[in-house]
Amino acid sequence: GFAVLEAIARQLSDDIWVCAPAEEQSGAGHSLTLSRPVRVRQHAERRWSCTGTPTDSVMMAIGKLMPEKPDLILSGVNRGANLGDDVTYSGTVSAAIEGALAGIRSIALSQVYSKEGMGDTVPFGAAEAWGAKVLRPLLAMDMAPRTMINVNFPALSADAVKGIRVT
């Protein structure tokens, strides 16, 4: 999902900065790392991982790594839906919330999938094909300050997706 997120971001801008958790953080919610130092490792220019949570990653990026606040924070692409009560457990959604709390337009992206017959494989085709198409109109909208958007791509192949609906 992370490679798909980068591909989507590159369709929107050439000025991409990445800071993500070094390890899987499913179910991390809006937690912070308080019991140990958060370590940052640089992998390339404008590309880091940190030993903390998704929220730690956002805080580290905007507070320490970037020279100025970004125009946009994208979080995801999460494996699975972030709908209903699940959003409260989601590190993906919480990273976007942290960005919004910092006054930055923030969008969480998730790819819904069906586990039946797929094992651990998540088809990110819908997110990959539709990501930038969904984000462009969202970015053109006026948003109230400290607002985040949560996008879920359906469990369909990219060509089976018929369009976009904002709810």
Where in the sequence are the language-model features?
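N-terminal beta1-alpha1 ligand-phosphate binding loop
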Residues: G1-R10
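A cross-family phosphate/adenosyl-ligand binding-site feature
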Residues: A9-K64, E68-K69
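Short, Asp-centered acidic motifs that coordinate Mg2+ and/or phosphate
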Residues: L72
